[in-house]
Amino acid sequence: MLAIIGGSGLTQLSSLDVSHQQVVRTPYGEPSGALTFGRIGKQEVVFLARHGYGHTIPPHLVNYRANIWALSRGAGATRIISVASVGGIRADLAPGTLVVPHQIIDYTWGRQMTFHDSLDVPAVH
């Protein structure tokens, strides 16, 4: 099954023929919302809005581990595509311009970076 995580501006998939929604509990807390299951053509898809339905969760509060666990372990997704949009600071790049960044400001510090953060579980490489 294919999982799609929608970022800002993508809180639903218009081409998704929805079959049901499901709330998934995870060992990492609550994901951003209920998972939406359905099909796009012949492809089974599960969708999750990263910032919650209604865009109520700011980026620094998104529970990334719960989202990934819910989609992979909870829903059985074997592939995950995440769609995102970002802001920019260059006036000469209009909205809709596709760029490949070569300098990145990383605001991901201060949050868990792994699913394996316990000394009780041996590291697997």
Language model regions located:
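Metabolite-binding pocket within alpha/beta catalytic cores that recognizes anionic/polar moieties
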Residues: 1-125
